Amino acid sequence: MLTLENFKEQWERKFPDISLKHTHFLLAVSGGLDSVGLTYLMHLLGAKCTIAHVNFQLRGEESKRDEQFVTDFANRLQIPFKVNRFETAAYAETYKMGIQQAAREIRYAWFDQLMKEIKTSIGDSNDKVVLLTAHHADDQVETVLMQLFRGTGLHGLTGIPDFRNDSIFVCRPLLGTTKNQIRQFAKEYSLTFVEDSSNEKNDYTRNLIRNKLLPVIQEVYAQATENVLDTVARLKEAEVIVNNTITAFWKKGKKTRHGIETISIQHWKKVKDNHTYTWGFIQSYGFKPQQIVEVHKLLDASNGAYIATPTHRFIKFNDTIQVVPNNSNTEHIMVYVGEGDLQTNNGLLHFETVDAANMGEMNKEAHFAYLDADKIEWPLLYRTWQSTDYFYPLGLRKKKKLNHFLGSLKLSPAIKQRIGVLTMGDKLLWVVGKRIDDRYKMTDQTKSVLKITLLDRC
């Protein structure tokens, strides 16, 4: 049974860090039973709320009816509300996606915007802004069954999370409450709501499971919903244990040097036949489960072989796999002054101009550069090297392709990819941390020196 008291108890158990008193809640309200019930519960608790209703304009007069119902409902409870209408079908066609995906993108983008507006409106207050949705136990069971039949891992079988906090903070306080319990609560408080006729159509997989499959299952297993929820709870506990074990395993095989994460291939091969270990590591780098076999093949590939995702590259180098962000080769930073600091992906560059006569002994380590300041024209540009770059390495009188120069240093592909250069127009002054250009070195005629130091190397 759903009561105000047990709802509050569940809240304090599930969301101990989210104060009902010091949080502003954005309520996603369709006008259906579930969102009306949740809204009324928050109203009875005296929580600070704003109602948000999205009119997707997909059901003609019924969509208009829902919008009017939510408007009247919000006014009756004296809760601030926002309504927005979207051309969902046109959005789906423009971006070549299904209606359900389009509706999801539209509503969460708008919710994100509203939450930022609410946060701005409350000013210096420390109150959190949290989105509440009315997903309930029946939704949870449907989701788990859909994941199971599609094929999934342990995480997929844990269903809908009680909360998530990525781009926006979302809580689902009714996940442990069945639709029948919400219906009884609504009846007790004489709450009215609207029915979405599309829920009766079996055009979507979820509706088929809800309308056709679950009733048959419940004829055989009367406690099916409760049993699935209990199983989900146990699987969530098991997932924590599995994740901790996987994290500990990879921690033993990983090192970070010069900002490059490297994994021992010998260590990886201990679990090569266990896809769960590999997936536990690679999923956060943009891989898909279908790529696990491809990643395993990389362990025995030739030096320099790699697999790329939209965010990272996994590169084979000797007895390691190196993990490099894809954006590491896009750095471009203008340098406008002759003195000061410049933060780069490879470390901090410190610039200073000194009198050649008073400079003292030069430090010959590679992370120091001494250039003839009178030959320098500002601004300079710090960027990642390119395949078309060339320069005159210190000590040589002829130009050399930078690609060939870096190749002679026997650098790993990951480190080579991240090398930065300091340029003046189309002239390369310094391969940072490696070699300056001979044309800009100090000479006996040098009066002023631009000294550059690479500090805090990544």
Model-assigned labels for residue ranges:
Residues M1-P215, N244:
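Core alpha/beta nucleotide-donor-binding catalytic domains of modification enzymes
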Residues N211-K212, V216-V228:
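Conserved anion/nucleotide-ligand pocket segment
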Residues Q78-F81, A109-D112, T158-D162, S198-N199, ...:
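Short, surface-exposed, polar/charged, turn-prone segments marking secondary-structure boundaries
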Residues E200-R206, N227-K236:
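Internal, active-site/partner-interface "lid" segment
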